[in-house]
């Protein structure tokens, strides 16, 4: 999962740097463009390392991942090709939450099915957390919202409320979940709380530092990993 997510992230950053000027790019895009050759070598190596892991997957999980990969490839095509030609506005801050939640929970869905309330709550809470993370980053890096999709503008306008809703959803899930699932929701609630705190002090930090911190808080599952069974 780590390799696949990194491959998608790095590929997305490299595609963002195609055809643009350095002045129009964020710092992370300039970094990936400057070191493009190194990233291409690393991406090739990571892809080769991923092949045996993919082939070892259970057939049910593999079929679901193939379907998700097709949808994701279509999304990349729309974002990096059609939007530039047709000047489309897309809900870029919403889609990572949908794709990440689906990718993270496919193995469990494949083994347990889709009719588990606890699993649905976990997937929704995780997806909303990723969306909240993306909206925070967008709000921190952009002063103007005119070019954003209406869903992004709406999310940024109610950013604090979305963060509070994520925390409350996670707390409700903790109350409903059994002992086995509770640590997952605790990690989600903690990450959302930390993102809310970062948003409150955003004026004291540089955008690059804020982005790094926003990614760091998503590592909260490491804190509860010893309690997962």
State what each model feature region is.
Residues 9-41, 129-167:
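Solvent-exposed interhelical
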Residues 186-229:
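Extended hydrophobic alpha-helices typical of membrane-associated regions
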Residues 93-136, 142:
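Functional transmembrane core segments of multi-pass inner-membrane proteins
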Residues 1, 50-64, 104-124, 172-183, ...:
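Helix-coil boundary and interhelical linker segments in multi-pass alpha-helical membrane proteins
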Residues 29-37, 93-109, 154-166, 212-227:
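Small-residue-rich segments of transmembrane alpha-helices in multi-pass membrane proteins
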Residues 148-198:
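Glycine/small-residue-rich hydrophobic helix-like segments
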Residues 3-18, 70-82, 125-142, 192-202:
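Transmembrane alpha-helical segments that form the membrane-embedded catalytic/substrate-channel core
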Residues 35-111:
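Intramembrane alpha-helical segments
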């Amino acid at each position: 999962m780590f390799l696949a997510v990194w491959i998608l992230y790095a590929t997305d950053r490299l595609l963002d740097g195609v055809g643009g000027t350095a002045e129009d790019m964020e710092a992370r895009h300039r970094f990936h463009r400057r070191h493009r050759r190194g990233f291409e070598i690393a991406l090739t190596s990571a892809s080769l390392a991923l092949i045996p892991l993919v082939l070892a997957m259970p057939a049910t999980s593999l079929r679901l991942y193939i379907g998700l990969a097709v949808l994701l490839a279509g999304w990349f095509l729309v974002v990096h090709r059609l939007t530039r030609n047709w000047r489309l506005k897309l809900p870029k801050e919403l889609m990572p939450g949908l794709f990440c939640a689906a990718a993270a929970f496919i193995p469990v869905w494949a083994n347990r099915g889709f009719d588990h309330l606890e699993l649905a709550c976990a997937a929704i809470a995780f997806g909303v957390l990723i969306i909240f993370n993306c909206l925070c980053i967008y709000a921190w890096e952009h002063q103007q919202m005119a070019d954003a999709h209406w869903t992004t503008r709406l999310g940024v306008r109610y950013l604090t409320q979305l963060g509070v809703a994520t925390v409350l959803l996670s707390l409700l899930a903790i109350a409903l979940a059994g002992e086995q699932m509770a640590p997952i929701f605790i990690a989600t609630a903690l990450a959302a709380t930390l993102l809310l705190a970062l948003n409150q002090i955003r004026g004291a930090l540089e955008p690059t530092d804020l982005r790094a911190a926003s990614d760091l808080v998503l590592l909260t599952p490491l804190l509860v990993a010893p309690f997962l069974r």
